[in-house]
Amino acid sequence: AFDQALQLRADAPGQYQGESPKPYWNMVGPFGGVTAATLLQAVLQHPDRLGDPLALTVNYGGGLVAGSFQIQAVPVRTNRSTQHWTLSILQAGPDGAPVVTTTGTAVTALRRETWSVGDAPAPQVPKPADLPAIPPAFEVEWLRRYEMRPVTGVIPQVWDGSGDHSLSQLWMRAAPPRALDFCSLAAMADIFFPRVWLRRARRTSRRH
């Protein structure tokens, strides 16, 4: 399902057409992680790409609706080792005119021999097999696309304002299992539930 969700048709260099993926539907539009992964996929498919993804920032202006969309991926600056991108997703609005739903930036870079160091050690947590997988919460499709085994930071069981932290720690993988790559990592980076849900543990009511 994930690879199908990322399928894009190139109309011209940097111009791609895609379809909103129903298997990754959220409460409003697709799961934001798969939207981010689709933007990155456009960069990876661009014939002028230099190097591999180094950074990705996505700004969600509005939810995608069901149907087709267009991605514009533009390499705005290419240096000797790095390349900088601007990204946007457009869909037809109520009047048929294109409307920007999502924007983003990305940086790709050539891999060179250098040094590396890890300043933040991995947290000491139980092994995945020692933690139960949580069933999908809410009636949204995208939660069925992942297996999650939380250590801490699950959705509050009681919404009484008793939240005291916003830390989420969990093991996760695609369901069914799929090898990790740049796009799947970009999608998984958005899996965590909203911080405010954990910190406040309080529902809000809408006024009509």
Spans of features found by a protein language model:
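Terminal targeting signals and extreme-terminal segments of soluble enzymes
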Residues: 1-208
